[in-house]
């Protein structure tokens, strides 16, 4: 396969933005489910306890091993092919849940304009979202990056306008009450952490396209440094201003247009239209950017001989068109299935894969101390291990608290374990029919 380096810093910042966030969408359900005070506290805590350690570790790994396949390559270098396959498999399973959500999100905001869409029409819209994003991806990484910039600016401008319009109407503390009435504190904390974590995960996703990034050893860490504050500020500023100027108890999933009507006074109606359009744009851009990232996992595994060779082929643009098309076909099938109750399982599978990546940095630092890129965390091995332990503790807390909520927690944990448990037998099948790895994984 021959790839083409076309992503510079700014497009990569917005690809990361849509790999992780896409705007404050779903924050409204976090506030409604757990209460504004707890929601705001969680939105401050997760970036410090999860995202900051993750971005630092991902930045060093991406700088150290700037290869197509990203985290799959890091785990392969540290732990070998078995654990690399598990990492890729877990990623693929949670991507099926993840990618089924965005067409649903698109339909939610489309419902603001067309509230009576039937099931067949919604599924048709979902397919249009999937294959519209696929058409952009087939043109290569550069069009995905450029479209991400345009979509990101449109979404961020909408929420900036809402913030400015809501400020004159702020009439109460946005963090009151701390907990939603009638909620069990531990159950609310577990659910809130899971929802918030889902809104902050994915900083490693775009590492899979590093073979298509210009000067990736420097560009990926630099893009992370811009994207993290952009995402965090977007969540906090929007939630604070809207909660201070509206009744949080009436918030609901997909409810930003209604929040704009309640919080923005005379500007409520035009802002509601803007945010409904922004929700649709964000959903399409999320699918678009994540298809770019997720499709490179079968590409990397195929280049190692663990999947059919045709998935590693690239076209004249340097695009792995077969991997993109096969990924889109799977996501189209799973768009028929409702995964609304499996967001916690999605988070757990991602976290399991991420912990393997953290372990990769620790092992590579110890085993190959001379292996380094343009960026390195300015800490010794012990401090880096402690840094990686912080999000690991957050994960254990979430698992423990999730068990307090039998409606969501226990089924999600069982689903995550079942999905992960399929990895070893699938690896055995893959190695039984393994092909010779491709020798050339170069980029132009």
List the model feature ranges, each with a label.
Residues 33, 345, 349-350, 381-444:
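A generic transmembrane alpha-helix motif of multi-pass inner-membrane proteins
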Residues 4-5, 40-41, 120-121, 150-273:
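Helix-loop-helix junctions that connect adjacent transmembrane segments
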Residues 121-172, 183-184, 224-228, 343-357, ...:
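Membrane-interface loop-to-helix entry segments
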Residues 147, 183, 310-319, 354-408:
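C-terminal membrane-solvent junction of multi-pass transporters and transport-like membrane proteins
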